[in-house]
Amino acid sequence: MHPTVKCFLCVILISFLASCSSVTGSVTTTNAVNSETPEETAMPATSPTPTATPTAEPPTPLPPSPTPSLFDIELPVGEVKYEIPLNIRHVTEDSATLFFELDTPSRGYVSVRSRETGAFPFTIPLDPSQARHLVTAHNLVSGSTYDALVAYEAEEGGYSQPRFLDRTWGPVSFHTRAEGAPLRIGVIGDASFGDKTTTGLVDAMADANLDFIIHAGDVVDRIAANANPFDSYKENFYAPFEPLLTMMPVYTVPGNHDYDRDINYEGEPFYYYAFPPFPDPRFPGQEYAERNQHYAIAYGDAQFVMLDTQVFYGEPGREEQESWLEERLADPGFKVTIPVFHVAPFNSSTVHPDDSRPVRGTWVPKFETANVLLTLSGHFHTYERLMKNAITYVISSGGSSVLYAKGEKAPESKLYKRESHYLLMELDSETMTYTAINLEGDVIDEVTIPLE
């Protein structure tokens, strides 16, 4: 790299730090905390009690010189690689949680810039003792667009961006929600093979001006022989979902294949390593969960309750989840609750149709006595809309080319379409509307649900 460019880049980083209005620490799977001198908290392995870790010493800057913005310079792709590429874990009206992991601990920065004003409300040094970073930028402006960037200090001097599959990743941007604005959500399920059908659906959702994505489970399936889970996720999830992961949060629930033994990492499903808990001010404490097995996200008067149906088939955590679900369903602070989980309580599939029984027997009675009008599920590799006692149960699991045939029609079934598809869901103060759209862009179903 030319010495002048090295100088330019370092000086820009100085200006970033000088302009920060909110600075938080670089951490390992934890929420960063606002302070003048950042104090960091490390995600505990088994305990919900946060543990402080030292603040990273920033790289040594070079003497000042007028420079263009670091965001406007094409940083070279360096030798450090993303094991998990920079993605938007969660966004609220005034904050955003970012997550990534490098293949080696590195000195550098993560920075956020306002696209409207050019201001840098968030710039922190990376902790050079850590490769994994989950950081939250606070004091953002609602209804605004921000760019995010990771730059590390290269051995030969200057700054580089991490590489992803021998290429660049991103650029990464996100939009904070304006208070009271209607929601636009994309829903997809069982998009677990990284095939061309999935990438086509992802591209369509990326062009739909969405706030976030809901993934109804089975994130990655069919792991190649001797492949490690990092490589499998890169090829089957991060690469095909890149147009979405670099623009908005993708909220997931675990499916049965997310527990497959061939994708474990350090004795646990890699799913939980890839999707760590994150902070949400309306659900304090959930960022300290040992597993991100069940959690909630809130947007205005709606809460999305994310659940794990594998507890019905031998996975631990059922009793704890049931207690938490009852608490969420009873919360009077929300006008509507939308449960999201992998195995639907009703189905008309030829493939494992009996899987619905424990879900149906346990959760349907609870939903019917709460403010639930709609649930979102996957598992059966099709589109199906079912209804019972004024609740619409949607199966949206046509996220790939692998589709299941229709079996005996369930009494609750209103429509069954064996088509690859995604859902476009719109939610305002009066109605929920969702549209099922196939790979060709044709509407295969559309439903509007009044919010009572």
Model-derived regions: residue spans:
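Bacterial N-terminal signal peptides that target proteins for export
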Residues: M1-L9
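C-terminal motif of bacterial Sec signal peptides marking the signal peptidase cleavage site
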Residues: A18-S19
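Short acidic, glycine-rich surface-loop motifs adjacent to enzyme active sites
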Residues: V220-I223, P332-T350
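Extended active-site neighborhood of metal-dependent phosphoesterases/phosphodiesterases
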Residues: N87, A151-S173, A227-G333, P353-R357, ...
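Conserved, compact domain cores that house catalytic/ligand-binding motifs in diverse enzymes
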Residues: P182-V253, D258-Y259
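Divalent metal-coordination and catalytic microenvironments
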Residues: F100, D190, I213, D218, ...
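Acidic, histidine-bearing metal-coordination/catalytic regions of metal-dependent phosphoesterases
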Residues: S22-V187, S192, D203-A208, L424-E452
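Histidine-centered catalytic micro-motifs
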Residues: V340-F346, T375-Y383
